[in-house]
Regions:
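Long, ordered, helix-rich scaffold segments
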Residues: 1-188
Length: 188
């Protein structure tokens, strides 16, 4: 859908106040489409997400928005400002993780998407601390899949290497663990 200028401004400023989940999803879709089609800037879309995603209640909508952030951050942000945009997204996800309802699906989704964006030393340290248990999130268990996702994210950024992959594989020497280890090794 396309919104006229006034409707777009009103909807984007108030997306988190829209009560009907379907209407909210349509507004989010319009925002994603506008960023994709360069009708609004990708950085504006990122700011919209972090101004309103915290209150989104629909798990599928959250996942769709996070996937759009991946596309937006990796394809639509100009290369010259991409590192800053990816750091902004990671910082926003860390903030959302800490504010999310304990044990919620949104909390899990924010953690799972974080390794895709985390670039700075502080973001890498946050992931290491979550992986090691130094950071404890209420209601959140760092299960084996999350361990692999964090490990792979740390490998992608050169923080972890073969020894950490081997240690994780020793912990999870299953078919799934073998698949995750292959993915982590491919990220070296």
């Amino acid at each position: 859908i396309r919104l006229d200028s006034l409707s777009n401004q009103t909807a984007m400023a108030n997306v988190s106040r829209i009560e009907d989940p379907m209407a909210r999803a349509l507004v989010w879709t319009a925002a994603c489409d506008a960023a994709r089609d360069a009708e609004t800037s990708s950085s504006d879309f990122i700011e919209l997400v972090f101004a309103h995603l915290e209150t989104e209640t629909e798990s599928t909508t959250i996942q769709t928005i996070l996937r759009q952030l991946v596309t937006n951050g990796n394809l639509y942000i100009p290369i010259g400002t991409r590192p800053q945009a990816l750091e902004r997204i990671a910082d926003g996800l860390i903030d959302l993780v800490t504010k999310a309802k304990a044990g919620s699906d949104s909390q899990l989704q924010f953690v799972k998407f974080l390794p895709i964006f985390a670039r700075s030393a502080s973001q890498q340290q946050w992931m290491q601390d979550l992986l090691s248990g130094k950071i404890q999130l209420a209601g959140f268990t760092v299960d084996q899949d999350v361990r692999w996702e964090l490990t792979t994210g740390l490998v992608m950024n050169g923080v972890f290497g073969e020894s950490e992959i081997a240690a994780e594989l020793a912990r999870d020497n299953t078919a799934n663990g073998q698949r995750f280890a292959a993915g982590a090794r491919a990220a070296i």
